[in-house]
Structures are given as C-alpha cells and as structure tokens.
Amino acid sequence: DEVDRWSGFTTERDRLARTIDSLGLASNLVIVSGDAHMVAVDDGTHNTYGPGEGIGVPVVHAAALDRTGSVKGGPYALGTYPNRFSLRGANDGQYVQMAVSDAGGDEVCVTSTGRRWEYDTQQMVDLLSWSRCFPARLLEARPEPR
C-alpha cells in the first residue's frame, strides 16, 4: 500500500530516477524542497545521486513562510536555518529566492538567496546565498524508460 508521503512512492521515485539517468541530467540538477520548515542549502557535498559514489546534487530547502521551524536531513554545506518562533505571538517568515540567469550562452546559472523577516526587529535578514552555473545544452527527445 502506498502511503501519502514521499517515502511511500517508491515506484514513482524509481521512475523519476530512471528518467533523470536516461537523459543524463543528474549533473545539471538542483533539488528544491519546501517541506522541512527551514532554509538550508547543500552544494552537493553531502547529497549524492546515483549508484556507487554518485554525483553530488545540490539541495535547496525553501521554507517556512509562517510555521515554526524544524531541521530535517543533513548535514548541509551552508548550514540550516529553521524558522524561529517569536514569544510575541508571531513566527518569523522566511523563504528562498531563486534566480535563473540564461543569456543564451554556454551556461545557465542559478542563485539561491535565503531570507528571513524577523518579526521582533521588523527587519529582513539574509541568511545564505549560493550560486552554481551549469553547462547549457539542448536535450534530444528520448523515449520514456520503462
């Protein structure tokens, strides 16, 4: 029986992994998640994809706008920033802004900036910033793996 959470969808995860492999995309991939109620980034140092030693795949956690924070997984190369709870009755709010730069050249660059709106001080604070450029290439249409 499949359970309605990520760990329950083994068939779908396997299909997604086979599709990524068949297209050769693992080295050009950034995983974005919002489920952990924290801002955190790993540059691929601690998150590998594929058989054996695998390929380091960056992970960006981008949450939580208004929920009490938590830390899940890790370690993360750029640290973890769980959303803080304020004793004044409101949580801080935080998010990650992702900017993709594609000028039609040889590379596409992604910049992720984690920010927090501090309720107590009423100020925006930058938590972290991470950038990575990937080689730009056109993908050929291939049949879906079975």
Predicted segment positions?
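Long, structured stretches of catalytic cores involved in phosphate-ester chemistry, encompassing
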Residues: 1-146
